[in-house]
Design a protein with these regions (language model features):
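Structured beta-strand-rich core segments of catalytic domains in phosphoester-bond hydrolases
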Residues: 1-33
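Metal-dependent phosphoester-hydrolase catalytic domains
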Residues: 68-79, 86-167
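Short intrinsically disordered coil segments
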Residues: 10, 42-43, 155-160
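His/acidic metal-ligating clusters that form di-metal
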Residues: 17, 24, 50-85
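Active-site-proximal beta-strand elements of phosphoester/diester hydrolases
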Residues: 22-48, 81
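Alpha-helix N-cap and loop-to-helix initiation/capping positions
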Residues: 46-54, 97-101
Length: 167
């Protein structure tokens, strides 16, 4: 019916106990293409940024099925991390996109509908940290406030490995 959603590259939710505290870990890898999943005309779909729209649907589904199932999640330890394949509005001083660009849909959803905090942005406001060779930040770590208060530092590590593999 067109309303169904599939998380093409996968997502997972694990609960682990550390020091007597339960931590919810959500990992993900969203759709990487400019065109929508199963688009018949990939070029046209890409021009319409339908890949961004599809990723936003994946993100809503992931959040609805994980943190969205727990009424008091904002007071618990939650972390969501992975390859979001999407840029964030907080980095738009680097990208220079129009404010209504669909590229922001994924992170706009997270910031507007969940208690998650982008920890790299929070710890390094205004200090852009790319996560890809092409100069974009598409890999993110989000946390709820209680878990974030335990963080001492966070940054993108550039150790040479990414130069040998593809973004």
């Amino acid at each position: 019916n067109g309303d169904d959603i599939i998380v093409v590259h996968g997502a997972g939710w694990a609960q682990v106990e550390v020091g007597g505290k339960e931590i919810n870990l959500v990992t993900l890898h969203t759709w990487p293409q400019r065109y929508a999943y199963k688009a018949e005309n990939q070029a046209e779909s890409g021009k319409k940024q339908e890949g961004d729209v599809f990723r936003a649907k994946e993100m809503k589904y992931i959040c609805d099925q994980t943190i969205g199932t727990v009424p008091d999640a904002a007071s618990q330890y939650w972390m969501m991390l992975g390859d979001f394949n999407a840029v964030s509005r907080v980095d738009n001083s680097i990208y220079g996109f129009d404010e209504d660009n669909k590229a922001f849909l994924v992170h706009d959803y997270v910031s507007g509908n969940t208690p998650y905090i982008d920890i790299v942005d929070r710890l390094h406001p205004g200090d852009f940290q790319k996560s890809t060779l092409s100069g974009r930040r598409i890999d993110f770590i989000y946390m709820t406030e209680p878990l974030f208060r335990k963080v001492r530092s966070a940054e993108i590590i550039h150790d040479g490995y990414p130069t040998s593999c593809r973004d």
